[in-house]
Amino acid sequence: MKDLHWHGHATSRLARVEMNGHRPCTIWFTGLSGSGKSTIANALDGWLHRRGCHTYVLDGDNVRQGLNKDLGFSEQDRVENIRRVGEVAKLFNDAGLIVSCAFISPYEKDRHLVRQLLNEDEYVEVFLSTSLADCERRDPKGLYRKARAGELANFTGIDSPYEPPVRPNLAFDTSTHTVNEVVGAIFDYLVAKGIVRQHGAVGRASVG
């Protein structure tokens, strides 16, 4: 690896920000299966896109059908899954995008690694704190039923641990908050951080 060198880009990050009209960031959704990560990530993505923001969603199931299809659900593979996604999110941020990442990401150390990969002021951790009981009651993919029946091993919350975030930027229980309420609160947070303005853009003077 010592013979590898990072090749600089002709287009600077600042130039991309000025063209896009907003700053890049990674919004990292973490929580149990069924807590609403993909639903809220996609709703937020649509909200931002309609306001002219350049966005993308990285979803756990989607990534495992391509980039990470060689990985299983052992602890080692889960760690590698999140590491790869963190690196992809970093590249997308370098390209100027607002990236919503929807991953169970059960281990605190892995989420911390992603935070360290990115610029601190461009990482927003959103913990969907919906209880195991509520998530299992929803069971949109039938995964909890399979895990309880012994048909699915290493399932988070059943026979594999989930470590709640120590200091998430935002936390919501989706059993008591609607999708629109959560999306609106996240958008307000992005506005407060200067990532976007209320109409979706950041002025040139705010970039730095």
Curated annotation (Swiss-Prot):
One GO MF term attached to the UniProt entry: ATP binding
Catalyzed reactions per annotation: adenosine 5'-phosphosulfate + ATP = 3'-phosphoadenylyl sulfate + ADP + H(+)
Keywords: ATP-binding, Kinase, Nucleotide-binding, Phosphoprotein, Transferase
Pathway(s) it belongs to: Sulfur metabolism; hydrogen sulfide biosynthesis; sulfite from sulfate: step 2/3
Database matches in InterPro entries: APS_kinase, P-loop_NTPase
EC number(s) reported in the record: 2.7.1.25
One Pfam family named in its UniProt record: APS_kinase
Cross-referenced CDD domains: APSK (cd02027)
Residues spanning the signal sequence: none
Active site (record annotation): S105 (phosphoserine intermediate)
Gene3D superfamilies documented for this protein: P-loop containing nucleotide triphosphate hydrolases
Residue sites binding ATP per the record: G31, L32, S33, G34, S35, G36, K37, S38
Keyword check for ATP-binding: yes
Gene Ontology BP term (one): hydrogen sulfide biosynthetic process
Domain of life from the UniProt record: Bacteria
Family designation: Belongs to the APS kinase family.
Its biological purpose: Catalyzes the synthesis of activated sulfate.
Official protein name in the record: Adenylyl-sulfate kinase
